[in-house]
Amino acid sequence: MRSGVIAQKLGMTRVYNDAGEHVPVTVLRMENCHVVAQRTVEKNGYTAVQLGVGMAKVKNTSKAMRGHFAKAEVEPKAKLAEFRVSPDNLLEVGVEITAEHFVAGQKVDVTGTSIGKGFAGVMKRHNFGGHRASHGNSITHRSHGSTGQRQDPGKVFKGKKMAGHMGQTRVTTQNIEVVSTDSDRGLILVRGAVPGSKGAWILVRDAVKASLPENAPKPAGLRAGAKAEAAATEGAE
């Protein structure tokens, strides 16, 4: 199990495939995605890596976090996230993951915070059909109708679909295809829509319901450097 990455949603556009068909894609950008910390079985009871992405102003970073980033020898990060990995895919602190971590045609799972819609009725929130427009109906055209039964059970069951706050929740979309990557600009183009607004942070992982392509880099797609070469050598061993 490889590490995922943190990317920023830039928006949507379209590209053309070899057949001349246009493909709607969401553009995700990886900027300075470094490994900030490790989690090991001996010390933490599980294996994972903590990644940091983006750039944060030093004056807006707490003293404790400045020490955390200094220990990893990386600049203060705007976003941190942790990814579970298998022991053979554990990455060294300080290495940088690039967009080449994913390959074209690969399936990934993306996680983000959906766009908030505020307080919404059941027709918008749960796709209810609503009531009749006329023939004796008054005021209840868009209401949800009955909420329960009678004295028995004498309550409204948990999970009843009703009006309420819509959106702004953690959403994961599975099996999205990677159309292409651009390691020079740190871009990942995935087919279709991705939850979240423009500028939102998105977590991208290998799909759990699809096999990993054989040409996918292991333990990760790393930026060339001394630390990257050392990590690749350890992974090969």
From Swiss-Prot:
Q: How would you summarize the oligomeric state and partners of this protein?
A: Part of the 50S ribosomal subunit. Forms a cluster with proteins L14 and L19.
In Swiss-Prot or TrEMBL terms, this protein is called Large ribosomal subunit protein uL3
This molecule's function is given as: One of the primary rRNA binding proteins, it binds directly near the 3'-end of the 23S rRNA, where it nucleates assembly of the 50S subunit.
Q: Which family does it belong to?
A: Belongs to the universal ribosomal protein uL3 family.
N5-methylglutamine: residues bearing it? 151
- What GO molecular function annotations does the UniProt record carry, in alphabetical order? rRNA binding; structural constituent of ribosome
Annotated Low complexity bias: 220-237
The answer to whether the entry has keyword Protease is no
The family database entries (Gene3D superfamilies) matched by this protein are listed as:
3.30.160.810, Translation factors
Species in which this protein is naturally found: Brucella canis (strain ATCC 23365 / NCTC 10854 / RM-666)
Q: How is it modified after translation?
A: Methylated by PrmB.
Give the start-end ranges of region Disordered: 133-155, 213-237
- Claim: Metal-binding is one of the keywords in the record: no
